[in-house]
Regions:
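Short cysteine-rich clusters marking metal-coordination/redox-active sites
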Residues: 23-26, 43
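Canonical RING-type zinc finger of E3 ubiquitin-protein ligases
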Residues: 29-38
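Eukaryotic cytoplasmic intrinsically disordered
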Residues: 99-125, 205-241
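Disordered regulatory linkers adjacent to lipid/PI-binding modules
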Residues: 125-127, 226-278, 288, 296-297, ...
Length: 368
């Protein structure tokens, strides 16, 4: 048997081992590439970033490239578990570890942080001060604003000018969330920050031209949230806190809605369903700064349910596929443009309704 064939078989056996069967960087199954300088098995997507890190990483295809005996022996001695012990030794509990379907900037900066910058050997500070491009509250334009995030008082401040002494806004991290939204923001490093102000959800849309900077901001928010929640929810453990640091919405998209009397004309609105706080928010457009309204979603035992609404000629509705969400106070009728969207929304509502309530949910006035 030729050494090329023999080495390919050895590599294919190595990649079947449990610790190597998923990409070392994003967890994608069945990695087809490997870094012969780091000794890790990675997927095609992550191999692209490794290919840019020529000082620390070199990649080959497991199946298509020729592997010399010494490189195969290096892969045998190392592997994903050995690399993880070295390069992820001190990853902070709050730090977001990107998964297969996360946006490019998160995966790219995670790989660079691990191998090129080797960041995870010291303690992260709970402070961040810098400039971000921020969308105006009632304008489409983005303008530079100075932001300061502090763990000392658990706040995020932003200033109109870099030398301003008085903050335009002081935002508590208590109900803050941050999520990457490159498509919505229109920039590959786009970040959406949400928080509560006067019982309404406020959106901030920001970005930074540098991918490392925006990922640092994202993880700084997670760091300060982590410190806050450890204090507020003591003695909760990390496994309970991690899902609360930052969360993606369960589903977003347009539906049409009518008013409480159900004879008002239907209007198209942008809806956001959040499973952690069990809320359905709606906005006029995806980039609105403030919600138009919100509905808390309890369990079936509290009188909440969702069902398909028969197709009918609804007053002012251009769309045909309806669904009804029943609550103790009123029924909400929504119309979807496509049948697939209707099914997806019903499935998402059912998922939230089926989740057990947590102690913090009982403070909602709808359940008292």
């Amino acid at each position: 048997m030729a050494s090329w064939d023999r080495n390919t078989i050895i590599l294919l056996d190595l990649v079947k081992q449990p610790e190597n069967a998923r990409c070392a960087d994003c967890g994608a199954p069945d990695p087809d590439w490997a870094s012969y300088k780091l000794g890790v098995f990675v997927c095609l997507n992550c191999s692209g970033t490794h290919r840019d890190l020529t000082d620390v990483s070199r990649v080959k295809s497991i199946r298509l490239d020729n592997w010399e005996d010494d490189l195969v022996e290096f892969m045998r001695r190392n592997g994903n578990a050995v690399a993880k012990a070295q390069y992820e030794k001190s990853v902070p509990a709050f730090y977001y570890r990107p998964q297969q379907h996360d946006c490019v900037v998160l995966r790219d900066q995670w790989i660079r942080a691990k191998y090129a910058r080797q960041e995870f050997t010291g303690k992260n500070a709970g402070f961040c001060d810098g400039t971000l491009w921020k969308k105006g509250k009632n304008k489409r334009q983005f303008q530079k604003r100075r932001f300061v995030l502090s763990q000392d008082d658990f706040t995020l401040r932003y200033f109109i000018k870099e030398d301003s002494k008085v903050a335009k806004a002081i935002i508590s991290v208590r109900n803050m969330n941050a999520v990457f939204q490159p498509e919505k923001v229109g920039h590959q490093n786009g970040l959406q920050i949400t928080y509560m102000t006067e019982d309404r959800t406020r959106n901030l849309f920001v970005y930074h031209e540098n991918g490392q900077e925006i990922v640092n901001w994202f993880n700084a928010v997670r760091a300060v949230r982590y410190a806050y929640l450890r204090k507020a929810l003591a003695p909760a453990n990390d496994s309970e806190l991690m899902p609360l640091l930052t969360t993606r919405s369960l589903k977003e998209g347009y539906m049409e809605k009518t008013g409480p009397m159900q004879w008002e004309p239907f209007k198209r609105r942008w809806f956001v369903l959040c499973s952690v706080d069990r809320k359905l928010l709606y906005f006029k457009t995806p980039m609105d700064a403030l919600e138009l309204g919100a509905v808390f979603i309890g369990t079936e035992a509290h009188g909440f349910s969702v069902r398909e609404t028969p197709t009918r000629g609804s007053r002012g509705s251009r769309w045909r596929y309806g669904l009804t969400m029943e609550t103790p106070d009123r029924n909400f009728i929504f119309m979807c443009e496509q049948e697939l969207e209707q099914r997806d929304w019903i499935k998402a509502f059912q998922q939230v309704i089926a989740q057990p309530l947590l102690p913090q949910h009982y403070s909602n006035k709808k359940l008292i």
